Structures are given as C-alpha cells and as structure tokens.
C-alpha cells in the first residue's frame, strides 16, 4: 500500500520529543536519519546516540489528512505555526521483494561464498555458507565481516579449533567449520545472538561441531588455534587481557570492528603478546592479525 512521509529537521536533543509528537499525530512508524550522513560507530551500552542535526521522519497511512497532522504539530511548543517540514507520497512497491533482490551471493577470498537461501549457489564445489540477512547480526556485507571472512579463507583450518569472540550470527565460526576447522566456539553477551548462531549452524549442518556460550557460562580454560573477534575498538582494548590468553602458543589472532584511525591504539593493547602483521584496510575499517608469542 502507498504511504505518506513527513520529515522534520531538528537537533539530536529534540528528536525524541518530536518523535513522540509525530506518533501522537498518527504516524505508524518513526525513523531518525543524520542530515549530513555522519556515521555513529560506538554508542555506549543502552544509549541511543543521535546526531547533532537529525531528520525525524514519520510514516503515515495514505488516507491520512496531512493538513490535520500539520495542524496538530503546529501546537507543539518546539514547532509552532508555519514550522519547516516536507511531505512526500511514497510509491507502492513490493518492499519484501525489493529487499530480497538486493542480496546476492558474495565471495570472500578464493574458496568461500556466503549465499542467501533464496539464491542458487554460484559454485557447488566452493565452500558455501547459507545465511539470510537479518536485522541485528553479520551476514558479510559489512567491511569488517568481509575482512574477517577473507582472512579465514586464507588460512589452513583443517583440524583446528577456532574461537569466534562476539559471534553475532555465527557467520565467522560457521565459515571456519565449513573451511575445515574441527571445532568452533562462539561467545556472545546477547542470548539472541547465541540463538541466531545455533539456528544458522543447524542450517549449514555444522551444529554438532559448534559450542556456544554466554560469557558467564564459558569454560574457565579455553584455548584455540585461531581466535577471531569482530566487535569494536573499545571492547577490544578493554578485553585485551582476556582475548590474548585464548590462542595457544603460536596460535593466530584476527581482530576487526576497528576504524583505521583506531588501529594504532588496538595494536598497542596486543603488541606484548603477539607478533603483529601489517594492518589491512577496507574502506574506513581495518583488520589486525598476528601470531601468539
């Protein structure tokens, strides 16, 4: 069905209040967008980080009388009569089909493909991981996930144990198992991530070789030949003492979720325990790898 959207521009501090006003005026959903496309990379836990200059967009049913909506909003103390806004009619589309059409099989390195379930695999003889795009967890489209998948593809994982620290969808652990690892361990603070990893492992036929833990449940003694952590620079620095003990002597470490501008500080946190390789960059993100001393 067609929709009508009304867009307001405000400051991040006022965005929540105007969101409430739009909902009270009849909006069925609200979206916040940065006016200048400035990314937010690391909000604090529990924090909704908004931009200094924010567009608040309300979506309304096509039958809505927008004159009535504007009249209601004009009574809001932050807006007033003649407030600046933009109203647009959105064309009717099969949004689900359009969303699905945007996702195609993706190749990482020489052997590995990530394929959504509604697409045919490009190469039956390749290493194929079947994974559908979700709302919260990695599917390979982000540069940091791509960097980690390319790194795993470059390794000989035959018979190895791999730890995926901050496993999310389980994409890295599952890819490692499909690439020949004997066992993978996924750790995440989010129970939904643990469930997503379990479901994706079952879909790919590797659930019998994947162990999944919340941090409070993980074994005290865990070691692996390869450890990969695609989280964020802040946690990677703070958790360096914990992550650094996970690889066996001579084991490999791969870190991502790091902006190129943050690479130096993350390297410093691991330099005493690892012989680090040159940093690899993709867009504004990077990957740090090394071998345990």
UniProtKB/Swiss-Prot annotation:
GO terms for cellular component: cytosol. GO terms for biological process: methylation. The keyword S-adenosyl-L-methionine applies. It catalyses: L-lysyl-[protein] + 3 S-adenosyl-L-methionine = N(6),N(6),N(6)-trimethyl-L-lysyl-[protein] + 3 S-adenosyl-L-homocysteine + 3 H(+). It holds the Pfam family PrmA. The keyword Methyltransferase applies. Its EC number is 2.1.1.-. Belongs to the methyltransferase superfamily. PrmA family. Methylates ribosomal protein L11. This is Ribosomal protein L11 methyltransferase.
């Amino acid at each position: 069905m067609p929709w009508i959207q009304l867009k307001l521009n405000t400051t991040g501090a006022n965005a929540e209040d105007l969101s409430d006003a739009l909902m009270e005026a009849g909006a069925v959903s609200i979206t916040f967008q940065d006016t200048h496309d400035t990314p937010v990379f690391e909000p604090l836990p529990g924090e909704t980080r908004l931009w200094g200059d924010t567009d608040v967009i309300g979506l309304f049913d096509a039958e809505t009388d927008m004159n009535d909506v504007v009249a209601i909003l004009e009574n809001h103390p932050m807006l007033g009569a003649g407030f600046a806004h933009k109203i647009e009619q959105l064309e009717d589309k099969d949004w689900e089909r359009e969303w699905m059409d945007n996702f195609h099989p993706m190749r990482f390195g020489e052997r590995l493909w990530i394929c959504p379930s509604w697409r045919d695999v490009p190469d039956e003889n390749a290493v194929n991981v079947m994974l559908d795009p979700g709302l919260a967890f990695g599917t390979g489209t982000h540069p940091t996930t791509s960097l980690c998948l390319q790194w795993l593809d470059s390794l000989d994982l035959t018979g190895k144990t791999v730890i995926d620290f901050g496993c999310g969808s389980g994409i890295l652990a599952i890819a490692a198992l499909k690439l020949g690892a004997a066992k993978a361990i996924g750790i995440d603070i989010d129970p939904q991530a643990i469930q997503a990893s379990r479901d994706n492992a079952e879909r790919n036929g590797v659930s019998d070789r994947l162990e999944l833990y919340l941090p409070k449940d993980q074994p005290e003694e865990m070691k692996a030949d390869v450890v990969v952590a695609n989280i964020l620079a802040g946690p990677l620095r703070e958790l360096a003492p914990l992550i650094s003990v996970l690889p066996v002597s001579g084991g490999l470490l791969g870190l991502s979720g790091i902006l190129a501008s943050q690479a130096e500080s993350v390297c410093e946190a691991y330099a005493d325990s690892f012989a680090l390789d040159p940093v690899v960059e993709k867009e504004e993100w990077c990957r740090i790898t090394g071998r345990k001393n």
